Amino acid sequence: MTTRLEPLSPAKASLMTRLMWRYTKRRFGEVPEPFAVYAHHPGLMLAGAVHEGMLDRASGALPASVRQLAVYRTARTVGCSWCVDFGSMLMRMDGLDLDRLQQIDAYATSPHFSDDERAAIAYADAITTDPHAVTDEQVADLRKRFGDKGVMELTYQIGVENMRARMNTALGITEQGFSSGDACRVPWAT
């Protein structure tokens, strides 16, 4: 599938956009396709990049596996193949066990997930369901596990992934090969 908005070519991109692409290519091996599509609105692309950087730096209240599994589950539930692909690569880069992702549909009973991870994945499901199905009891349990700061971080991360996944899906952005190491779909990058 091709994207609904053509990725912006470097010839049409501003200097700032090309610098951002250079940074992401060095960091991830390829320019993430959403960046090439979002570049049609450089101001929003820059705002998103700054937000992502700040979000990454600010997120430390939760164990990485708890946060990343909840985000992965959200992307998968929404159906964003690009988010699943990129998220899998990030988890691999962080040294997390990717084999567990094959068990995520059975998280409630699978021995591959801790109780904290199960609670976070269930919360991601409850938030991502439309209408959401979050309960007072669920949040009370999460507060005991992670504290108020951890619940806020988990809620924010799941909410942001809902936004990312829904934007990418709406724009027709699909997997790019990051999880396989074969990232090459941006047309002008080959």
Label every model-predicted segment.
Residues M1-T190:
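Hydrophobic alpha-helical segments
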